[in-house]
């Protein structure tokens, strides 16, 4: 007869792992923040006019205005999420950018973001990406909005400072 180790049946829900739970937002913040900043930076470095032309081609109204709005949301919102500042405030416009990308660009290509079409001497050849990564970013933003930014964040430091001030009173 096999005995079950009670510690294993509880998994990570034991007190010794509880101290690690507070760190769960950190990788979400870092990848979402960095990802958004990287996309915004790429649009700037490759010439915003190319992005505006794409927006015009897919029928986005006021493509230059919407292009700059997108770039600013990606750069500023990405940085805010990366450092854990005003995450709830920036999550809404960031989610809007993702939803627009899903419905105007990625939806016709299905879910998968990686579509291997061929492997040639030049390397792997991929098709257009689907909406998978956008949905992952939305899930990460939702987790951060519903939870908190974590201890290594501007919001975490402000909360810690505020609680110390209250204790001193």
Regions inferred by a protein language model and the residue ranges of each:
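Extended, low-polarity transmembrane helix blocks
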Residues: 1-45, 64-72, 76-79, 83-169
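Membrane-interface interhelical connector segments
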Residues: 45-65
């Amino acid at each position: 007869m096999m005995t079950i180790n009670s510690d294993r049946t509880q998994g990570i829900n034991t007190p010794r792992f509880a101290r690690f739970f507070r760190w769960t937002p950190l990788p979400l913040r870092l990848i979402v923040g960095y990802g958004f900043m990287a996309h915004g930076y790429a649009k700037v470095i490759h010439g915003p006019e190319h992005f505006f032309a794409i927006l015009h081609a897919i029928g986005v109204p006021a493509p230059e205005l919407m292009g700059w709005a997108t770039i600013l949301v990606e750069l500023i919102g990405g940085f805010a999420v990366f450092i854990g500042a005003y995450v709830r405030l920036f999550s809404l416009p960031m989610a809007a950018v993702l939803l627009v990308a899903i419905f105007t660009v990625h939806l016709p290509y299905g879910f998968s973001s990686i579509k291997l079409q061929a492997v040639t001497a030049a390397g792997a050849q991929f098709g257009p990406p689907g909406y998978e990564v956008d949905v992952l970013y939305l899930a990460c933003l939702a987790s951060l909005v519903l939870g908190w930014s974590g201890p290594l964040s501007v919001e975490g430091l402000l909360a810690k400072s505020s609680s110390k001030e209250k204790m001193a009173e």
